[in-house]
């Protein structure tokens, strides 16, 4: 068994779990179960929102340490589920490193939803939120169109900068300016409802939930880091 390669591939699984919205405890448990499946009992895992460090001691008393950085995060629960399924398969069947590598690549190459569908979804959510907040139908139409533009701007700005708070500030500014002009030229009536409905699209609900779960489970450092990051993004 090449434990160094096992460590490398398992860290890729942990990295992808963390990037796609899994909580810290899920990452730790997944890695620990994988190592135990291959006969490794001395395991030390340190995971925070931006890094994973793992040290293992093999049955031959050799020690290996690797780390991996996490530079960005998103929400892709389909990928999280597939990575969880892969980790369960690994624990049950102990496949070769080559098999694990191929499955990781397969999951990474799995296409996400089409950008056009995601943009339309942003518009539909903004439209629905206006109705929920008792806005007019005209407000809903305006908010829906701004929601589509917001997602397009989000995709564009994300290619320039990975800093989530900065991205949200820029995109929120664009959405606010569009809402002001829409109301000024009588395309909409309630500026506050239009703006709130679009800003709601940027609130990181999954990240906030994971931060609280991490803190409840005792991962205070990771939970606090993620909570602060979430608050900065939301503000």
Please identify what each model-predicted range represents:
Residues 106, 150-161, 207-222:
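C-terminal ends of transmembrane helices
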Residues 107-114, 160, 231-234:
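Loop-to-transmembrane-helix entry motif
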Residues 1-99:
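Soluble N-terminal domains of membrane-associated systems
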Residues 18, 131-134, 217:
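Alpha-solenoid HEAT/Armadillo repeat architecture
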Residues 184-235:
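Generic detector of multi-pass transmembrane helix bundles and their immediately adjacent loops
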Residues 112-203:
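Core alpha-helical transmembrane segments of integral membrane proteins
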Residues 73, 79-139, 143:
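Hydrophobic alpha-helical hairpins/lids featuring a short glycine-rich hinge
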